[in-house]
C-alpha cells in the first residue's frame, strides 16, 4: 500500500509539473508576448520540452500498443517507425526537419522553424516513450490480461482499466528520466539556428556590455539544468 501511494504521488507530481508548464506557456505568465519567430532563451526551452512531454507520451503509448498488435501492417509500421527514429541522433532529425523537409514541399510553402523543431523533438521523444511503455506492459503478468478478458472487458477496456494503471508504476522512473534527458537535449536546437537558454547565455557572454560579467548567467543556467 505504501509503495502504491508513492507511485501515485510521483504520478500526480509529474502531471502537475506538466500542467504548470502548459499553463505558463498558454497564459504567457509574467513574460512579454513574443512572436514565435523571435522566441528564445528559457521560454524556448520550456516550449520545446513541454510539447515533447505532452505529445511524446500519448504517441509513445500508441506506438507501443501498435508494436504489440496482432495486425501485421500496424506492427510492421510501428516497429519500423520506432527503430528508425531511435537509431538516428536527435541532431540529425533536427537537421532533416529544418533543412531537408522544406526541399520536398511545394514551391512557396513555408513552415515556422519552431514548429519543425517541435515536431522533430516530439517524434524523437515518442519513440523512446514507446519502448518505455512496452517494457512496462511486458512486466505485467499474462494472468492480468486473462482476468480482464474473463470478466468481459474488451481490448481497450482491459488496457485502460486493468493493464495500463499497473504498468504505469513500472514506467514512471524511466519516463521521468527520459523527460529530464529531453529537457537537456533542447540545447541541440542551437545547431539549427535557434537560441535556447544555453545558446542565449553564450551569446550574452560574447556581447561587449557583458564582457567580464558572464559568470552569473552561466551559473544560473547550470542551476536550472541541475534542478
Per-region residue spans from a language model:
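Transmembrane alpha-helices and adjacent helix-loop boundaries
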Residues: 1-227
Amino acid at each position: 500500500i505504501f509503495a502504491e501511494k508513492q507511485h501515485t504521488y510521483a504520478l500526480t507530481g509529474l502531471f502537475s509539473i506538466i500542467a504548470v508548464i502548459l499553463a505558463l506557456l498558454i497564459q504567457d505568465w509574467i513574460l512579454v508576448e513574443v512572436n514565435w519567430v523571435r522566441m528564445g532563451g528559457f521560454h524556448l526551452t520550456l516550449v520545446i520540452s513541454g510539447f515533447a512531454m505532452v505529445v511524446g507520451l500519448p504517441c509513445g503509448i500508441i506506438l507501443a500498443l501498435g508494436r504489440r498488435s496482432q495486425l501485421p501492417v500496424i506492427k510492421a509500421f510501428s516497429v519500423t517507425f520506432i527503430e528508425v527514429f531511435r537509431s538516428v541522433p536527435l541532431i540529425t532529425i533536427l537537421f532533416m526537419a529544418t533543412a531537408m523537409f522544406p526541399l520536398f514541399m511545394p514551391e512557396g510553402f513555408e513552415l515556422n522553424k519552431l514548429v519543425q523543431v517541435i515536431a522533430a523533438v516530439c517524434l524523437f521523444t515518442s519513440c523512446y516513450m514507446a519502448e518505455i511503455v512496452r517494457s512496462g506492459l511486458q512486466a505485467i503478468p499474462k494472468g492480468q490480461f486473462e482476468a480482464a478478458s474473463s470478466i468481459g472487458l474488451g481490448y481497450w477496456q482491459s488496457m485502460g482499466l486493468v493493464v495500463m494503471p499497473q504498468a504505469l508504476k513500472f514506467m514512471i522512473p524511466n519516463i521521468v528520466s527520459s523527460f529530464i534527458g529531453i529537457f537537456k537535449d533542447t540545447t541541440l536546437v542551437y545547431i539549427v539556428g535557434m537560441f535556447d537558454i544555453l545558446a542565449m547565455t553564450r551569446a550574452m557572454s560574447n556581447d561587449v556590455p557583458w564582457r567580464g560579467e558572464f559568470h552569473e548567467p552561466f551559473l544560473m543556467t547550470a542551476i536550472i539544468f541541475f534542478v
